[in-house]
């Protein structure tokens, strides 16, 4: 997939701040420090489109990115970061729920989990939330380069088991370091935005 345009559009915390456009939207969700920004940067072939940070909880707004005038990526705040106040976490929760359940342009969610570990309770809650609201989901298991090739199947099976993964959903193992899984991720995203057209 050739990326000719990848640009930050705006940040928003409420529907009246969402950008006006006619592109299909794909949200990116995951716990803090799972590698959402690295995923966006790698598949968009940009070094700093989305800001990466060693500090979890950096994304605190809905961040909209126009990709090739074809798709709008929406980076949502990472969940599960303990050092953010309870009030702040609740605020993010309301903002995300409002966006995910009411945005007509939303075609689906890329849910990022760390392939090295079992999904957290928050990961399971998010996956169940998406299934409950019948929001199409792609599970992207990041940090693939951090495990041995011989261990991949075992880790993938563990992630799917913990999530009670629906086989009708798409699963992509991905590495932001090596770009492995990049083409598969794009195929899954394109399938998401073209279904039901």
Swiss-Prot record:
GO terms for molecular function: GTP binding; metal ion binding. Mg(2+) binds at residues 37, 59. Keywords: Cell cycle, Cell division, GTP-binding, Magnesium, Metal-binding, Nucleotide-binding, Septation. CDD domains: YihA_EngB. Residues 22-195 form the EngB-type G domain. InterPro entries: G_ENGB_dom, GTP-bd, GTP-bd_ribosome_bio_YsxC, P-loop_NTPase, Small_GTP-bd. Its cofactor is Mg(2+). It holds the Pfam family MMR_HSR1. GO terms for cellular component: cytosol. GTP binds at residues 30-37, 57-61, 75-78, 142-145, 174-176. The keyword Transcription does not apply. GO terms for biological process: division septum assembly. Belongs to the TRAFAC class TrmE-Era-EngA-EngB-Septin-like GTPase superfamily. EngB GTPase family. This is Probable GTP-binding protein EngB. The gene is engB.
């Amino acid at each position: 997939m050739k990326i000719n345009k990848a640009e930050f559009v705006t940040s928003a915390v409420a529907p009246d701040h969402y950008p006006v456009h006619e592109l299909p939207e794909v949200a990116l969700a995951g716990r803090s420090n799972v590698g959402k920004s690295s995923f966006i940067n790698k598949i968009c072939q940009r070094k700093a489109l989305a800001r990466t940070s060693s500090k979890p909880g950096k994304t605190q707004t809905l961040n909209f990115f126009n990709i090739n005038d074809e798709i709008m990526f929406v980076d949502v705040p990472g969940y599960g970061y303990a050092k953010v106040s309870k009030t702040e976490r609740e605020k993010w929760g309301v903002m995300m729920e409002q966006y995910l359940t009411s945005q007509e342009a939303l075609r689906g969610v890329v849910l990022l989990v760390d392939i090295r570990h079992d999904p957290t309770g928050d990961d399971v809650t998010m996956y169940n939330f998406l299934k409950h609201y019948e929001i199409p989901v792609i599970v992207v298991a990041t940090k693939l380069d951090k495990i041995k090739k011989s261990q991949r199947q075992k880790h993938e099976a563990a992630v799917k088991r913990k999530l009670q993964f629906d086989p009708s959903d798409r699963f992509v193992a991905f590495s932001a370091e090596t770009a492995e899984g990049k083409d598969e991720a794009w195929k899954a995203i394109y399938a998401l935005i073209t279904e039901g057209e």
